[in-house]
Curated annotation (Swiss-Prot):
It holds the Pfam family RHS. It comes from the Bacteria. PANTHER family: PROTEIN RHSA-RELATED, PTHR32305. This is Putative uncharacterized protein YibJ. Belongs to the RHS family. InterPro entries: RHS (IPR001826), Rhs_assc_core (IPR022385), T6SS_VgrG/RHS (IPR050708). It comes from Escherichia coli (strain K12).
Amino acid sequence: MQMLDRLESEILADRVSEESRRWLASCGLTVEQMKNQMDPVYTPARKIHLYHCDHRGLPLALISTEGATAWCAEYDEWGNLLSDENPHHLQQLIRLPGQQYDEESGLYYNRHRYYDPLLGRYITQDPIGLKGGWNFYQYPLNPVINVDPQGLVDINLYPESDLIHSVADEINIPGVFTIGGHGTPTSIESATRSIMTAKDLAYLIKFDGNYKDGMTVWLFSCNTGKGQNSFAS
């Protein structure tokens, strides 16, 4: 049986070994005779479909090259499938940016961890620890606007969807510990829009691997220096 399985694989790959040919010859058979006895392998015709996504990148429909809707679905804010129409039995596993539906678990694989849309949370902790904020399992608090393509958050506190996030990434001042984020006179926002106090931010700075005791800290954030006893002070 093992020999037949191997022979079948070799014939399908069109790479029959000399050993297999000798074995067939000893049985009075040829490769062509065996090939004619095998059931044809069904290979579906390849078809191109174009994605139609919402403003977050969540696929809502697959459009054929003829302009027909081959698949469509409706989701809630957290990515839960509410309904779908799939007359051609297409396999569409892509969800929110960076996510792929796992049929076995019902969860969404998000590169570094799994996201549960029913809970609106990750099921494992953020692998970058406190740099992602206090809540290790949190998904963006406003999923209508924000996404988390990698399942990670950077020390750069500007959301990745904001243009200023990439600008802040370019700030590199030797010997200075720099922080960027949206702020107010009394607080600063994390990358997931949660509010952080001065004490919260100080804790993150202290445990950041790039921070050394005595370093100058520069805060690139609007409004955090306004008024007396401001957040920046």
